[in-house]
Amino acid sequence: MTITVFATEYDPAHVIVNILCKNPSEHLIFPIIVKYKPSKNVYFCMQTQKCKFSKRIETVFVCDAESLNFSYYVKNALPIKSEDIIHCLNTEETENLYKDFLLSHVPEGSENIEFKSLVFFCKTIIIKHLTNKYLLPTSPFWFLSTYGQTEGMLLLTMYYYLFEEQKSTIATTKNYVQCFTDKLGDMVFTYSSMSEFINITLKSNYRKKFVSFSEYAKQKNIRDRKEFLYLDKQIDIFRNSVHLTNSFRVHYIYIAYSTALEKNKFIKYSQLTSYDPTRSDTSQCQENMYILGNSLHSDLISIMKQYFNEDSYFQNYVEIKRMLNNKFQMQQYVYDINSNRNIMLVINSDQISKMVNKCNKHGEGYFTPIKLGLQGFLKILASNKSILIDGKPVTRRQYLHDQFSNPIPMFRVQMSYKNLYCFGSAESWYKNMGFDQVMQFLPNEYISDESLTSTFWLQDTTFLSDEIEKQFYVTRHEIFNEYLPVTNYIGDLDLPLQDSAIITESLFFSMCKLMRNVLINAWQKIFPFIDKDAYPIFFFKTTCSNPENPLNHNVCYNEVETAFCVCKKKIGLRIAIPIPQGTAIIGSEPLKQLSKIFNHLMCLNHDLMQILNSVIFPGECFDTGIYNTGRCLRLGFMYKVDEENNRFLYGRLKPIFIVPEKMKKNFQDFVSMQLDLNNILHHGTKDQTITEIIYSIFDKACPTEFSFIDSRTKQLYHRKQSSLETLCLKYLHVNGFSETSCLSRDDLLMTFTRSIAWPQMLKKNIQHCEARTATQFQHVTFLKIDHKNIQLKKLQNGKLSDFSCLTRNHKGNRENVLVYLEFKVDNNRILIILWSKCFTTKCKSNSKQVHSSVVLDSLNM
C-alpha cells in the first residue's frame, strides 16, 4: 500500500476535522515523503508522539488512489487541495479509524448517525484527541531540526525512522546515514516555504537510495546489536568473576564502556561497518566481528584481572621500599607497662602550647625552636636529640620531667565534658586492668574461638569517673605520632549494616577467620619469613549498644537466641597486627596505603565477600584518617562516652580471639599476647633493636589521591591538570600582579592568599557568617603549613592567637581553634576551602570541619 506522511501550513488538527466532516476549506495537504507501492488506497499519516513496537506513524484518513491520481501530485511535487481529498475520501476505511473512539464519547443509540455528523458534533473531542496523539508541525523548520538539515540526511533519516519500524533512535539513524554515504547533499534552508520544501523531498535523487539504505541500516543494526551484546557479555563475565563493592561495580561498568567506546575506537568501528558498494545488501557489516568486545579484553579486562587477583596483584602492583642498616639510631617508646607505680603527667589542651614554649625557652641556643601546638609537643616526645651539660646528655624532653630521657607515648583520656592528655614512662597495666585475675579463669583446653571468647571475662563499669587515675584505664586513646617508628599495624574498621542483617555467632567468627586469612596472606607477602600458621592477629569488637533489646521486630525467638551481635547501624572492629621484631614502618602514608591494600584484598576473597555482602553495605571499610599526626584512636578494652549526658559508658572494645592453628595447643600464650599493651599500640615497645625500616608501601595502579578506577579514567581521557603553582601565577597575572618572577614557592602561595584568595573568602564570610564569627576575621595573618594549606592567625595588639570555635559558642569560649585555608585544583580553576579543628568533644575532638568554600573563575590556559 502507498503511505505518505503529510503536513499543513495551518493547524493540522482543524484541517483533518474539516476533511472528516467533508467541509471544504482552502487549506492544502503537503505530502512530505512517500513509501510507494501499487495499491487501491493512499494512506495519509502523521507521526505519533508515542510509539509502540517502533511504529511511529498512524493513518488519519484514507483516499482512493485512482480517483485522487496521487502519483500526479508526487511526480510534480504539488500540494493537494482539501476539497480534492474530500471528493476522493475512502469513507468506509476512514470511518473505521475513528468510529470506536467517537462512539465511546456519545450517548448510546448513536450508531446510526452519519459519520460526518458524528465528527461535527464531537469536533472538540477529536481536535483534542489529534493534538494529544500526533506531532503537528506546520513548517519545514521542525523537520529540518529533527531529521537533518542536508537533503540526504533529512530524507534517509526520515524514511527509515518513520517507515521501517526498526528499534533505532533518530540519532542512531543519523549515524547510519553517515556510515552509508559521505555525500549528504546541499543544505535545506529553514526559511523555505512548505511548497519549496516538498519540491525538494519529492524530487530528490536520494529517494532512489531509500531501499538500499534501509537494507544497510537493518544490517548495521543487527551488527551493532551483536557487537554490544558481546561487549555486555565480556563486561559481565569479569564482573561476575570478582566481588566488587556496589560503587566500584558502577565505576567499573562506566569505565568498561568508556574504554570500549573510546572516540578513536568508535570511529574505527564506524569505518569498518560503513556501507561497502562492492558487497550485496545482505552481506554488509560482516567484517571483523566483535572488535569492540575483543579490544576491551586487551585494553582493560586483562589489566583488571591482574589487579583483582591476589597473587598477581602483589607481584605487579604492590611496591614496598625497605632499608636495612644495623646502625639505625631509631628509638621506640621506652615505656614500662609492669611498673609498681604510674609515672605519668596529666595536662589539658591549653597547657600543651605552654609546655612547648617552656622547652623552647630552656633549650634556646641549644635546640631549634619547635612550633607551638600538639604536633610540636609530639615532636618533643619523640625527639632523641641531646646536648651535653656537665658531661651528661640532656634531651629537650627532660625539661618536661627529669626522668623522660627517652621517647614516650601520649594518650588522650576522655573525661566528663573535657579531654585530658597524659604522657609518661611507666604504668601498671596488668594490675589496673585486672588481667592477672582474668588469666586464672581461662579454660584448661582450647575448644574453639567462639567458646574462648565467650568464657573470657572482663570486669565492666557503667559510669564515668571524675578521677583521672580510673579513667586512664577506661577511656584512653593513643595519639598517633609520625615522628616515631610504627611497630604494630592498627586497623580501624567500620562495617555499615543492612537493615535486615542478623549477625549470628557462626557468621561473625567465620567473617573474622576469613579476614585473618586475607590479612595474614598479605602480611606474609610483605614479610616472607613469618609463619602464618603461628603469627598472631588480634581482633577487638565494639560491644553492642543495645543488648537489652536484641532484635525488636520481624524475627523469631530462635533468631534472637542465636544472635551474637545486635548492633543496628554498624559493626566496629579494631585489628592489630604486630610488625615482626626488628622491623618498623616509618611515616603515616605507608599505613594509609596498607589500609587501602587490605581493603582491596578483602574484596578478592570470594567467601568473605559472600558474608559481607549478605549483612553490610560494601565500601571502604578501613579508616585511613587515623594515621595523621595528632589523631587519636581508642585502645582495645576501652569504652566510648555517651555524648548526650557525658556520664555513661558504652561500646567497649572487647577482645575477639582468633587463635592461629599452631598456637591452639598453647592458646593461653596467645591470650597473653592480646592483653599486652605493647601489641595494641601504634608505637608499642618491642624487644629487638630496629634494623630494618619500611618507608614506602605503594599501589602502583593507585596514586595517593586516586582509586584504581579513577586512575584508569584519567588515563582514558588524558586530562592533564594544571599545578597549583601554575594557576596561582596565572591568577596573579590576570589580576595585574606582573612582578612574580622573583617569588619563591612559599612566597607565591602567600602572595596569592593575601591578594586574591583571602579577600574573596572574607567577603563571603561577612555576608553569610554570624557576627560573632565574622568579626574574628577582621585582622588576620597567614602561616604556610604545606604546599596546599595556609593557617590563619588572629593579630591582636601585636600578638598572634588562634580562634574561638567558628561553629559553636562553647563554655569558656577559649581561643584554641586552629583555622586553615586549603587550596585544591579543579581543572583550570582553584577551589578555596575554609576549615578548622576544634578540640572539644561536641566538635568531634579535633576532626576537620569545613565551613565555607569559594570557587575562582576558570582560566584560559
Swiss-Prot record:
Keyword Zinc-finger: yes
GO molecular function, one term: DNA-directed RNA polymerase activity
Enzyme Commission no: 2.7.7.-
Keywords for the protein's UniProt record, in alphabetical order: DNA replication, Host nucleus, Metal-binding, Transferase, Zinc, Zinc-finger
Compartment(s) where it occurs, according to its Swiss-Prot or TrEMBL record: Host nucleus
GO CC terms of this entry: host cell nucleus
Zinc finger (CHC2-type): 805-843
Site, as annotated: Essential for primase activity: 492, 494
Gene Ontology BP annotations: bidirectional double-stranded viral DNA replication; DNA replication
Main location: host cell
Pfam families: Herpes_UL52
Superkingdom classification of source: Viruses
Record-annotated membrane-spanning stretches: none
Family classification: Belongs to the herpesviridae DNA primase family.
Purpose: Essential component of the helicase/primase complex. Unwinds the DNA at the replication forks and generates single-stranded DNA for both leading and lagging strand synthesis. The primase initiates primer synthesis and thereby produces large amount of short RNA primers on the lagging strand that the polymerase elongates using dNTPs.
Complex and partners: Associates with the helicase and the primase-associated factor to form the helicase-primase factor.
Name of the protein this chain belongs to: DNA primase
Organism: Human herpesvirus 7 (strain JI)
